[in-house]
Amino acid sequence: VTEAPITDLEPWQEPVRGGPSDPAAFRLSGRSQLKALRDGLLRAPANARLTGRRLTKIGRRSVTFTMPASPWLAGPKGVIHPGALVLLSDSALTGAVLTGLPPGVLFTTAELSMTFLAEMPSPGGELVARASVLHNDGRHGLAVAELRGADGEWLGFGTSRVFLQPPLDVSGLPRLGPPPPDPSWDLPDPWARPCRPSPTVVAPAATVGLEVLAQAAQGVQPRPPIDRLVGIRVTQVDRGEITFSMPASEWLTNELGMVSGGCLGLLAESATSAAGQSLARPGSGYRALDVKINFLAQVPPDGGAIIARGTAVHQGKLMVASTEVTHQGQLVAVATGSTVLGE
């Protein structure tokens, strides 16, 4: 990464790059849409420009997405945030379903589940998500994904279910033209810039517990890089309860121009695991084990706050939490997850 000028703005506050796909793409089959995205015939969505995630392989019923394990994806422990795997897996899982769809079919993600199989790696190299279709009956699609780190280590396993809509009449759509030219930017895309301050791996005693979360809410402690990348802030802290806020920014949008399920999942996972962090004893660690997110409504990029409230519902060595995600007063997602304490 080349040295770049420092900007006072957080990445999500800057003018957005990328954008939704040309509606003419719906004239193409899902597989052809994926090829157009891979080959640059469709412009990359904003969340891909933010994180560096990209489509690299298309199989008969499978896809592979990669994403740089950038320092910008580090969480409060200094390693890659587990929510980054949720963000990446959402792209791969929906892409796998898309491989078998005819022209004009839209779909929405109903549910995404992720199991984390190991402690997250330090920044460096690439994260890889390989997803394939398990089932598609024309009304529902089910896909499965495995996520690996730079050295091939297995980091996570995910599944997703989508609802398929009846095909639209695409005969009136224009033919797909070239994507709009990209403006000239003074800085590289956010994920490729130096991250200041750099993430550091810190001892559990310095990273867990209610007091540290309270310091984050008060602005006493620097926010981790991934929070600065997407705009997440801790707004309220209590023992076993945590509230995060994230702006419905254009930077978080997918190919359809809506805030992506992966970004909502990142926020939900953050609140779910932080509820466990608030219960951790001084000097002990914590590790997210899994998260399941049910998506209830789409979120437009209107700049309004997306609120995630995580609440511990069971405390022991294994902490279970639930999270409600709202936008403009509407419930848009619910999540449950477990966190092991003392690791």
Language model features: what each stretch is:
Residues V1-E343:
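Terminal targeting signals and extreme-terminal segments of soluble enzymes
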